[in-house]
């Protein structure tokens, strides 16, 4: 119990510190995710991915906030960190003052900047919309910091509790489970993912809880476990479109075991909860996910056609490197030697795991982990191309 309380305290301290120390808009695509939250909080309804724009408040803040060179390639009008820190203290202080004094009424006025994150499912943004509305009278930097803290605290606690349950299913005893959780909470990429405004803070813990629910369904099939798994997956589908890749696993568990009642229950729940959002995408954009790539014609047949031409060793290494350490929108990373050492250690652990005996829960976790790695690469490519295109 003492170790668990220390882990919770460690998570809360990291959540708050990372949220307040991260520069404004340094989180992955953060101003665009925030604009989604702001549109919902202002009662303007769900955004249209083809026409949604940032508010003038957010647009003005982007011009007053320093950004990385990677962001400057996409938005040449922003000030780079190098330029910003070459200014005298008085000029930097004036820029911060102007940032704090941006009129809050500009939140109601659209800017010229398109919101390329408007295609995302709405659940995570809806949960942040109420706090954003309650904090509307505060300056933009304060609101962003508070929303980050809310997201990071909620996401880390959900992830911690879900990971504990998953470790229990995998029969990982203490102190190994505690050490693994400590390593997880010490991972920079975890906080880069959770401690910024977006939908990742909810998607990551939901993925873990979905695995927990799928393991329960696999071990103890029944109507209740099927309903819980379907609700967890529906929540994921309303947070990130990549949860579509988990649907075959849920359906497969029911079909392989010929649990037709459970299949009917899961189908009704998924269609009833997540179906309207994806039906909206089909009606509006003609594609299921609504993403920029899908709307541009990059579908599954296209991906399969070009797959043989991909340099897969480079893709795998890039995926590993991105997942180990990516310094937010600055895209900084560790040295190659450090990453090689971490990768070699992880590979050795994986080989030891392969050589051991496995329960069903472990194999379902492995399947979803492999799928998640592929989708993580896809996601990383999206936020790289979005800022640099």
Set out the residue ranges of the language-model regions.
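Transmembrane-helix signature of polytopic, membrane-embedded enzymes
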Residues: 2, 138, 142, 163-186, ...
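Multi-pass, polyprenyl lipid-linked donor-dependent membrane glycosyltransferases
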Residues: 28, 150-153, 174, 179-209, ...
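Interfacial juxtamembrane loops and adjacent helix segments
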Residues: 43-148, 299-301, 318, 330-333
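Transmembrane-helix motifs of polytopic, lipid-linked glycan transferases
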Residues: 145-171, 209
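Membrane-interface transmembrane helices that cradle and orient dolichyl/undecaprenyl
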Residues: 168-171, 210-228
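Perimembrane helix-loop-helix junctions
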Residues: 216-219, 245-271, 278
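Membrane-interface alpha helices of multi-pass inner-membrane proteins
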Residues: 225-241, 246-252
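Membrane-lumen/periplasm interface segments of multi-pass, membrane-embedded glycan/lipid transferases
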Residues: 282-359
